[in-house]
Amino acid sequence: MRHGNSGRKLNRTASHRKAMFANMAASLITHEQIVTTLPKAKEIRPIVERLVTLGKRGDLHARRQAISQIKDQDAVRKLFDAIASRYATRNGGYLRIMKAGYRQGDNAALAVVEFVERDVDAKGAADKARVAAEAAAAEAA
């Protein structure tokens, strides 16, 4: 019997699930929007919302708790500096999950997970370099 066992297993071991959610949370904090399958999106929401609440607390212990969960110093820095201040007056509900159709290869239900008041220009370093190169090429042409 599975009484009281909440959460989806997603056909992964516990360590794989933990690592996957840590990577997804870091990507979501860095890019402020990700596309994933609907069950993964529903599972990542409480994890990231808890991290944003830690960011709003802002003390050293909260920062260490966040680092122990996502292992990405840059994402934690952005979480505590930019994202926490953005949601200082909001009590929960920091993420939005929108259904995004079905994946062509296996017909899996997709979803877009994004921050409610997200920064549209938030991109990772690779994306910033690519956008800058495209802009420079467009001006040169």
Swiss-Prot record:
The keyword DNA damage does not apply. One of its GO terms (cellular component) is cytosolic large ribosomal subunit. PROSITE patterns: RIBOSOMAL_L17 (PS01167). One of its GO terms (biological process) is translation. InterPro entries: Ribosomal_bL17, Ribosomal_bL17_CS, Ribosomal_bL17_sf. Signal peptide: none annotated. It holds the Pfam family Ribosomal_L17. Gene3D superfamilies: Ribosomal protein L17. NCBIfam families: L17. Part of the 50S ribosomal subunit. Contacts protein L32. This is Large ribosomal subunit protein bL17. It comes from Agrobacterium fabrum (strain C58 / ATCC 33970). The gene is rplQ.
